[in-house]
């Protein structure tokens, strides 16, 4: 009997020992499994945090550049400012804020610039501002822009004083301009955001695009880069204007064309940045003289040839315009409207007789 009790006790002890070992193994195994699970979860969290957050883009699209801007700014009419471009008038002020710049010859083979602005709100100095030539009015009308100038040729005065174009000039809003003492007249006339806006308010011009106005250009979509099918490389573009002798140089890193004139970089003195653009359009036009024998006029209706330059390449294009107050369309060799890369554009009017002076090279 005593012997049986010992056997039973031994068996019970063995069972208890086995149970304890089993519990330890289970506990140890569970702990190990838990650590693996935690490691997996930790790794997942680390991978998630490395994904960059996306910033919501403004909902508006610029009519001038195709880029995202605020909806309020996107529906606002641009202003077009006439820039003096002789050597006594540089450096320019505020022009780096422009989305579109037109360059065209005037008397004496010099050029003037017309800069189209959407956002000029912070600019205290814009210019120097110079006088109007009639064909610049038609450039401004293509963009439904309010045209700012100081003075005008006698051939433009009647048009400016009619209701054909909303304009801010010396004859109707002289208080919107001011003169500086660092240059001699007439190269020292400037305006500002405050001067422009107060003049527009005084003259009662509407501030939003007219109903039904559509974007002048078609632009590449976000994250899209237009690469022309042409094999013609365009790393340097000389425009052929004889006085300021401007040219652009392509920077492959940022896809921009940087501008030079008068033998040096073309700088905006308000931010000390060199002017640059994503697109260049060269439009060959016929030009004649008015009866005074010196004032230039341009034929902007009909059709003609030109160049479209972007992303390091150039292709031949044709341009068409049915009526003076209409829109100029630029067509590729297949007859389709060109698509521009997002960003600034420089549009250059070159007289047909000087077309061979335009040089596009590697």
Residue positions per predicted region:
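A surface/extracellular/periplasmic glyco- and lipid-processing/surface-interacting theme
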Residues: 2-4, 38-41, 46-102, 107-362
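N-terminal Sec-pathway targeting helices
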Residues: 2-16
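ASCE RecA-like P-loop NTPase motor cores
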Residues: 19-21
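Compositionally biased non-globular segments, especially hydrophobic aliphatic-rich helices
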Residues: 12-15, 30, 45-52
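Hydrophobic single-pass membrane-insertion segments
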Residues: 23-36
């Amino acid at each position: 009997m005593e012997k049986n009790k010992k056997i039973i006790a031994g068996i019970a002890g063995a069972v208890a020992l086995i149970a304890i070992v089993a519990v330890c193994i289970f506990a140890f195994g569970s702990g190990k499994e838990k650590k693996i699970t935690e490691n997996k979860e930790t790794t997942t969290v680390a991978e998630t945090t490395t994904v960059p957050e996306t910033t919501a883009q403004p909902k508006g699209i610029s009519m001038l550049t195709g880029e995202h801007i605020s909806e309020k700014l996107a529906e606002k009419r641009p202003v077009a400012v006439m820039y003096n471009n002789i050597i006594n008038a540089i450096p320019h002020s505020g022009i780096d804020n422009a989305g579109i710049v037109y360059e065209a010859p005037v008397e004496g083979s010099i050029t003037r610039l017309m800069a189209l602005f959407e956002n000029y709100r912070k600019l205290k100095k814009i210019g120097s501002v110079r006088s109007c030539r009639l064909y610049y009015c038609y450039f401004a009308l293509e963009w439904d822009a309010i045209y700012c100038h100081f003075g005008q040729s006698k051939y433009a005065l009647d048009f400016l004083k009619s209701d054909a174009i909303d304009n801010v000039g010396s004859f109707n809003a002289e208080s919107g301009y001011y003169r500086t003492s660092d240059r001699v007249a007439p190269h020292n006339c400037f305006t500002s955001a405050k001067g422009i806006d107060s003049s527009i308010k005084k003259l009662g011009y509407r501030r939003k695009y007219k109903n039904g106005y559509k974007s002048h250009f078609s632009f590449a979509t976000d994250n899209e880069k237009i690469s022309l099918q042409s094999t013609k490389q365009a790393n340097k573009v000389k425009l052929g204007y004889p006085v300021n002798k401007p040219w652009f140089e392509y920077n492959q890193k940022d896809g921009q064309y940087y501008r030079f004139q008068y033998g040096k970089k073309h700088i905006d003195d308000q931010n000390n940045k060199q002017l640059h653009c994503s697109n260049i359009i060269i439009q060959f036009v016929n030009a004649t003289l008015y009866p005074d024998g010196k004032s230039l006029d341009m034929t902007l209706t009909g059709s003609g040839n030109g160049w479209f330059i972007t992303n390091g390449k150039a292709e031949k294009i044709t341009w068409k315009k049915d009526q003076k107050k209409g829109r100029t369309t630029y067509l590729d060799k297949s007859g389709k409207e060109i698509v521009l890369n997002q960003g600034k554009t420089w549009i250059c009017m070159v007289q047909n007789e000087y077309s061979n002076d335009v040089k596009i090279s590697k």
